[in-house]
């Protein structure tokens, strides 16, 4: 099938995946642009966003642009970052205390932007995501308004021509 949904979400670690993923098969260069209007508070560092995947198998090469609440106790602190798994069954970027500050994220090699305004107190403002594939380069951008974009980062990941985006 060229589009569908992978369902699940119990536990994921650096080498396995387990999450909800609605996807479409794309060929070659592609991009996805979407707005995240709100998110449910679940746990520290829970990811929500968009991604390119080489396959639907756990451990697939991945470029994922999204955001995570840094601490569940502080509902206004969100970080937008570009995570990646460079090799099949390799480790994905460690999304934990590494995204609590731009300095920690930089040490961990995780591109991060922390000054977008996704949420103000109890009000959701939303955040736009744009993830682009050009050859083996994946570049992520984020925006408060969908017009002015801030580059989050880029990763080079060798992937097949046909990959999944969602």
Show the residue positions of the predicted features:
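Extracellular glycan-recognition regions
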Residues: 1-166
């Amino acid at each position: 099938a060229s589009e569908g949904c992978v369902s699940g979400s119990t536990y994921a670690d650096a080498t396995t995946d387990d999450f909800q993923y609605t996807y479409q098969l794309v060929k070659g260069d592609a991009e996805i642009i979407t707005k995240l209007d709100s998110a449910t508070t679940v746990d520290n560092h829970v990811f929500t966003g968009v991604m390119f995947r080489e396959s639907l198998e756990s451990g697939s090469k991945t470029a994922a642009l999204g955001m995570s609440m840094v601490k569940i106790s502080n509902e206004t602190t969100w970080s937008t970052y570009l995570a990646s798994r460079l090799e099949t069954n390799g480790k994905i970027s460690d999304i934990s205390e590494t995204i609590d500050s731009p300095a920690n994220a930089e040490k961990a090699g995780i591109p991060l932007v922390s000054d977008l305004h996704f949420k103000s107190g109890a009000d959701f403002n939303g955040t736009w995501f744009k993830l682009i594939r050009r050859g083996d380069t994946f570049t992520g951008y984020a925006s408060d308004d969908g017009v002015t974009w801030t580059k989050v980062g880029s990763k080079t990941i060798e992937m097949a021509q046909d990959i999944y985006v969602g």
